[in-house]
C-alpha cells in the first residue's frame, strides 16, 4: 500500500510562504539552496539525496538518489535527476554572488562540493525556516492530531499493562515503541539539537530518571551504554516501589507529538516518601493545566515561563525541570522547534502553533516525577491537548 503523499496544494502554499518570507527578510534575494532532507521534505514532500533550488520565479528539486522514488511520491512540480552539482548550473546558469542556505545543517564539506561548480557566498536563512515551520497548516495539524490520538492510546491505554516485575527499561521502551509502530507510527524521533539523536525515546526507573543526558531535556536516562544515552538499560529491572518515567514520542507522516507519563509501580502509601511523591505529581499536574490555560494566540512565551516559575512550590524549586531552563517547546517535523517557553522568547504565540508542555520535578533518591502533553494553539480560547490528559493513572499494582 503506497504511503500518503503531501498534497500539491500544500507544497505550493509552503513555497509561496517561503518566497514571501524571504522577500520580507531581504527584498533583493535572488536564490536559496537547501540540501537537508527535512527541509526537502517540508517543501517537496520527499526526502532524497539532492538539493532544492528556489528563486523568486522558479523552483527545482535536483535528485541524485533516488529520482524514481522522488517522482513517485512527490507532487512537487519540477523534479530533475542530477549526476553532480554541475547539473544545477545547467538549469540556473546565472548563480548569484550570495545564496541563502540553512547554515545549521549545511556542512563545510557540502558547501565545498557546491562551490566547486557554483561559486557563491552562503548566507544563513535558518530563522526564516524556523518561523515558517512554527505555524502549522490544516494539513499539518491533521497529521499531529492523528499522531496525538495514537500517542494517547498507547501511552495511557496500553503502557500500564506492559509494566511487570523484572522487565528491563530497554525492553519496556522497545515494547511501547513497537506498539506505536504496529499502529502506523514512524518509529523515529527527529531533533534539531546536534547533541540529540534520532531515537525511540526513554524508559527510566527511579534513580535512573535523574541521570542527565547531553540532550537539553529534564528526562534522565542511563541509556543502553555510555555510547547511547537513550532507550534505557537492559540491566535495570522493574521492581515494586519503583517510579517509572516514560518519555516516548510518537509521529505520523513526519510530524511528532510529545508526551511523558510517570507511574508508581506498587502501592504508593508504602513508600517512605509517598507524601513528597504525591505532592510533586499534583504540583506538575497543576502547572501543566495552568500553562495550557495561558497558551493563547498573542501570549508571550517568556511571560508564560516566568508566571509558571513563580507558581512552583519553594520545596520543589531546586529540582524543578531537573536543571533545565525551559518549560516547553514547539514541536512538528522535529521534537525541538521554536518558539520555546523560556526566557528570551518574546514573539507572541500564533494560532496554529503546537507546543509540548513538560513540568517535571526531580526528587533525590526517588526519581523524576511529572507529565507532558502536546498542545495546539487555537484562534480563540485556551490551547487544546492533542495527546490526552496529565491527571492519568499513577499507581500500577504488581500483578
Which stretches of residues belong to each language-model region?
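Active-site neighborhoods and metal-handling regions in enzymes and metal-associated proteins
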Residues: 1-399
Amino acid at each position: 500500500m503506497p504511503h500518503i503523499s503531501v498534497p500539491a496544494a500544500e507544497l505550493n502554499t509552503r513555497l509561496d510562504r517561503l518566497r514571501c518570507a524571504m522577500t520580507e527578510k531581504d527584498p533583493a534575494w535572488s536564490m536559496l539552496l537547501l540540501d537537508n532532507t527535512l527541509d526537502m521534505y517540508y517543501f517537496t514532500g520527499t526526502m532524497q539525496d539532492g538539493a532544492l533550488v528556489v528563486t523568486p520565479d522558479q523552483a527545482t528539486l535536483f535528485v541524485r538518489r533516488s529520482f524514481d522514488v522522488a517522482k513517485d511520491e512527490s507532487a512537487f512540480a519540477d523534479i530533475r535527476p542530477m549526476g553532480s552539482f554541475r547539473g544545477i548550473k545547467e538549469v540556473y546558469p546565472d548563480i548569484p554572488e550570495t545564496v541563502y542556505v540553512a547554515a545549521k545543517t549545511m556542512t563545510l564539506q557540502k558547501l565545498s562540493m557546491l562551490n566547486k561548480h557554483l561559486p557563491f557566498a552562503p548566507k544563513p536563512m535558518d530563522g526564516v525556516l524556523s518561523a515558517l515551520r512554527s505555524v502549522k497548516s490544516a494539513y499539518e495539524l491533521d497529521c499531529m492530531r492523528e499522531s496525538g490520538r495514537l500517542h494517547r492510546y498507547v501511552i495511557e491505554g496500553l503502557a500500564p499493562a506492559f509494566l511487570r516485575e523484572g522487565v528491563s527499561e530497554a525492553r519496556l521502551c522497545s515494547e511501547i515503541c513497537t506498539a506505536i509502530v504496529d499502529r502506523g507510527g514512524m518509529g523515529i524521533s527527529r531533533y534539531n539539537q546536534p547533541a540529540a539523536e534520532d531515537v525511540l525515546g526513554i524508559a527510566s526507573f527511579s534513580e535512573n530518571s535523574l541521570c542527565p543526558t547531553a540532550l537539553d531535556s529534564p528526562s534522565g536516562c542511563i541509556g543502553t551504554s555510555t555510547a547511547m544515552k537513550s532507550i534505557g538499560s537492559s540491566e535495570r529491572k522493574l521492581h515494586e516501589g519503583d517510579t517509572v518515567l516514560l518519555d516516548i514520542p510518537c509521529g505520523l507522516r513526519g510530524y511528532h507529538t510529545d508526551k511523558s507519563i510517570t507511574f508508581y509501580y506498587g502501592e504508593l502509601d508504602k513508600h517512605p516518601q509517598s507524601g513528597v511523591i504525591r505532592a510533586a505529581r499534583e504540583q506538575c499536574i497543576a502547572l501543566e493545566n495552568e500553562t495550557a490555560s495561558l497558551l493563547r494566540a498573542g501570549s508571550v512565551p517568556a511571560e508564560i515561563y516566568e508566571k509558571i516559575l513563580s507558581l512552583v512550590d519553594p520545596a520543589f524549586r531546586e529540582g524543578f525541570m531537573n536543571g533545565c531552563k525551559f518549560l516547553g517547546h514547539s514541536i512538528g517535523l522535529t521534537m525541538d522547534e521554536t518558539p520555546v517557553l523560556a526566557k528570551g522568547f518574546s514573539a507572541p504565540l500564533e494560532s496554529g502553533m503546537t507546543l509540548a508542555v513538560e513540568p517535571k520535578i526531580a526528587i533525590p533518591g526517588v526519581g523524576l516525577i511529572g507529565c507532558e502533553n502536546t498542545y495546539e494553539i487555537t484562534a480563540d480560547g485556551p490551547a487544546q491537548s492533542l495527546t490526552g490528559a496529565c491527571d492519568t493513572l499513577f499507581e500500577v499494582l504488581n500483578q
